[in-house]
Each structure stands twice: as C-alpha cells, then as structure tokens.
C-alpha cells in the first residue's frame, strides 16, 4: 500500500518536471520568491492602483530570444509578447500569454502559452492566466472599473540582451534625432495606447498613468540569496574566462583571440550569452577608449592588455576588469602606476559593510592611502599626483550597481543612503595620466553582506606578480590555434 501511495505522489511530480523541461521554464526562483516581489510592489503602489508590465517582443531573425529584465524578474517567463497585470485593489496577479503557436513550437520548441494555464499557475504562482487575445476591445476600461485607479507602467527603457538603461537612452535619443527614422520607444508607445484605450474624460475620471520604473529599480537593488548565488556563479565564470585569456596572451596574438578564449570558458560553463560586449584592449590608445570593442589589434611586446568581460548567466551578470603585460613582465613604470590602484581597491573593499555610506568608506580608505603614500615614495612625481588625484576624487571607487544588467537599474541610488545587505555593485578604481594618455584600472564586483562584504572576484589574480605568472602559462589559444591564418 505504501509503495502505491509513493507512486501516486511521484508520478505527478515527474510529469511536472517533464512539463517544466519541455516548456523551458527557469528553475532558479520558486513561486514564493515571485510572490514576495509582487507583495513589495503592491506595498509601493498602494491598494488603489494597478500596474501593467510589458514583456519583450519576438526576437528578430536568429537573435537569441531573451526576455526583458523586469518581466523576467517578476515572472521568470520568457514567452515573448506577454503582459503582467498586478491589481493593487485585490492584490491579485494575472499573466497574459499569447495563444499557443504550434508552428513556432515545431521549429523552436514549446513555450508557456495561454494553453498552459494550470502549469503556469504552478510554476509562477499567479492567480490568473489569460490569453493576450482577451486584452482587446474594452478590456482596459473594464479592468480599471468606474473608480479608475492610477495605472503604473515602466517609463524607462527595458533592458534585454547585453543592454543597460543608459545605453538604451542614448540609442533612443539617436533614433529620435534621425530625421528619417524618429520611431518612439516601445514603452512610450505603450503609454500612448493606455491613454487612448483607457476611460475617456467625459465618461469617467481621466486615467493617470504613472512611472513604475523607480519602484522596480528599488526592488531590484536589493538582491535575494538566490540572485546573489547567480551573480556569484556569473563572476566565477567571468574570472576563469579572464584567466584563460591571460594565459593565452603572447606577442603576435590578436585581441579577438583573447576574447575567444574567455568566451570559450563562458559557453563551456553554461553561460548562453554575453553580459556585455567584450572590452579586450591592448596598447595605450585602445585602453584609453573606455568601451573599446573592435578587438582587432595584434598584441605587441611592451603593451598592457585590459580585459573587461563577463557573461550573462541565467539573466544575471558580473563585471570584472584586469590588466596584464603582453610580454609577461610589467615595467617599473607600469608597476608604479598599478600598485596604488590595487592598494586603493583593497582599502575600499575591506571597509565595505552595512550601515555606513559610501562617503564614509571613501574617507576611511583615503586615510589609509595617506599612510601608504608615506611608506611608498614614487620615483615619478607625475604618477604620484595622478594616484593622489584618484584618491581625492574617488575615481571609479564605487561604480555602478550590477545585477540583471551590467549597469543595473537604479543608477547610483545605493550611494545616497547607508549600505544594506544584498546591494551589489562594482569597485573600479581608476588612475589617469592625461599627459601620457594613460588610463589604468581594476574592477571587481562585490555584495554587501550582513557581516561586511563578499568580493565575488577575489579568486582572480590581481597582484602584479600573480598576473605575470598567469601570462607564462599555456592558454587555450596555444592549444587550439586558429584554423587558418588571415592572408597578408
């Protein structure tokens, strides 16, 4: 009898597991975590408001499909052209999914759809699952009712693959200024449609559409334990990718070969996509181009390499940067510039903890650097001035937040209040010598913990001797050389 009971319990679980795998649904977040996020959102918008979050459109051509960060954060659903309706009056959540597309499923595999109601409820925990076809006609007016609550929706661009909000803002501005284009961003078009299809002034109070972006930014700024685990894994993969690139460094190798070495490690460890395009820069001019991306230059003895590169691992990323010598040996001048960057980074990270502001930490690290300057005289006065300027200005010290995007939403809001556990950001101290066109930096991604800080990338070599040693090892580029040489 006991075995038969176990069978009846086991069979549905196995069927659910098979269904989940068949629908390609994420396994990192349970329904309880999504419910916690919805509850926080409800608390912010109030009990007399509703929210609508639009998912990503279909991928163009053979682009890798990827959901927008906010929609994935709230649902874990990757199906394109989906919508999430959160009703603060009832605290009920409805997801609208497209009807099942059998033709698409035959070509690309199954996705959650309006035909998988029970499965979606089990996986996501939503109260209702409906078809996007149900959103036609008077759906919006009927859903709002006679009292017409405020309607929240994101006003700011929603990030997708290898995208951050700042870069999207720039792209949208360029499109708007193009006299032969001028398309409105998708989120702006949605706002216009909501106003057009909502209640009219003559038959109900006018619909007030409000910005949900700041609320989502605040929610995403504090990472859960599961989110931290994904960023930790993304950081590990990024670090080992950079290690493989450093091992592969030789004079005569091309920047794109180092890029390939790192990307090989990313793919080998389950990262499907890049978190952002690779910065693999060699030589003064390329390094001094902050977001250099061409990666076509041949490495030359005497140059430094800057690699800043990390994957997108299950919708979470890291941010990491290291510099090393092409020929395996730092010059005395390079050491004199890089040592203060490393020491400043260490002093900053050691002092990160909850309950203090970044300004307090900057002051504490600056005091520690004063002692270091006293004990470590410079041979080059210009370099000393550059190092002191870095500390005085806090250049790059507390950089951008990191999470689902490399420059995560929320801008630099974490610096405006005492630090809290779960805040993730990059520490990127930067030294500049404009007279010599020099720009040097090291970058790590950290999380504030209840006891202090965790540096996700502290396993990666950063001390100069250790970096030199890495470049003397054989890398994948030497083990698997290019198939053919580019013709001269």
Residue positions per predicted region:
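Active-site neighborhoods and metal-handling regions in enzymes and metal-associated proteins
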Residues: 2, 20-488
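Bacterial N-terminal signal peptides that target proteins for export
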Residues: 1-9
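Bacterial N-terminal signal peptides
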Residues: 8-17
């Amino acid at each position: 009898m006991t075995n038969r009971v176990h069978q009846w319990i086991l069979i549905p679980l196995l069927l659910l597991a098979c269904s989940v795998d068949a629908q390609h649904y994420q396994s990192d977040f349970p329904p309880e975590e999504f419910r916690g996020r919805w509850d926080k959102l409800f608390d912010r918008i109030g009990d007399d408001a509703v929210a609508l979050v639009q998912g990503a459109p279909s991928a163009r051509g053979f682009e890798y499909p990827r959901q927008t960060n906010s929609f994935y954060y709230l649902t874990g659903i990757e199906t394109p052209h989906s919508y999430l309706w959160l009703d603060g009056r009832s605290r009920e959540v409805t997801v609208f999914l497209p009807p099942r597309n059998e033709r698409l499923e035959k070509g690309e595999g199954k996705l959650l759809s309006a035909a998988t109601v029970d499965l979606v409820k089990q996986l996501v925990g939503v109260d209702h699952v409906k078809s996007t076809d149900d959103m036609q006609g008077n759906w919006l007016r009927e859903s709002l009712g006679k009292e017409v609550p405020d309607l929240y929706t994101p006003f700011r661009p929603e990030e997708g693959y290898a995208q951050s909000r700042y870069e999207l803002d720039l792209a949208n501005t360029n499109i708007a200024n193009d006299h032969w284009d001028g398309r409105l961003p998708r989120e702006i078009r949605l706002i216009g449609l909501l106003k057009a299809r909502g209640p009219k002034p003559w038959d109900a109070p006018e619909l007030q559409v409000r910005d949900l972006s700041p609320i989502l930014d605040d929610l995403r700024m504090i990472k859960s334990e599961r989110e931290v685990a994904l960023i930790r894994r993304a950081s590990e993969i990024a670090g080992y990718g950079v290690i493989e690139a450093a091992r592969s460094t030789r004079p005569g190798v091309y920047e794109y070969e180092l890029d390939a070495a790192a990307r090989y490690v990313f793919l080998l460890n389950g990262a499907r996509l890049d978190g952002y395009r690779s910065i693999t820069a060699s030589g003064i001019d390329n390094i001094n181009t902050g977001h250099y991306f061409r990666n076509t230059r041949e490495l030359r003895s005497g140059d430094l390499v800057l690699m800043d590169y990390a994957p997108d691992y299950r919708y979470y990323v890291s941010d990491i940067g290291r510099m090393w010598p092409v020929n395996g040996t730092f010059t005395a001048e390079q050491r004199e510039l890089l040592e203060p960057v490393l020491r400043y980074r260490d002093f900053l990270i050691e002092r990160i903890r909850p309950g203090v502001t970044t300004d307090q930490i900057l002051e504490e690290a600056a005091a520690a650097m004063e002692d270091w300057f006293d004990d470590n005289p410079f041979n080059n006065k210009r370099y000393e001035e550059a190092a002191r300027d870095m500390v005085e200005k806090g250049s790059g010290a507390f950089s951008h937040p990191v999470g689902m995007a490399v420059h995560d939403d929320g801008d630099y809001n974490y610096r405006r209040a005492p630090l809290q556990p779960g805040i993730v950001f990059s520490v990127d101290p930067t030294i500049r010598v404009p007279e010599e066109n020099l720009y040097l930096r090291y970058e790590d991604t950290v999380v504030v913990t209840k006891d202090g800080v965790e540096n996700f990338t502290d396993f990666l070599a950063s001390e100069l001797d250790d970096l030199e040693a890495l470049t003397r090892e054989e890398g994948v580029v030497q083990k698997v050389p290019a198939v053919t040489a580019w013709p001269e």
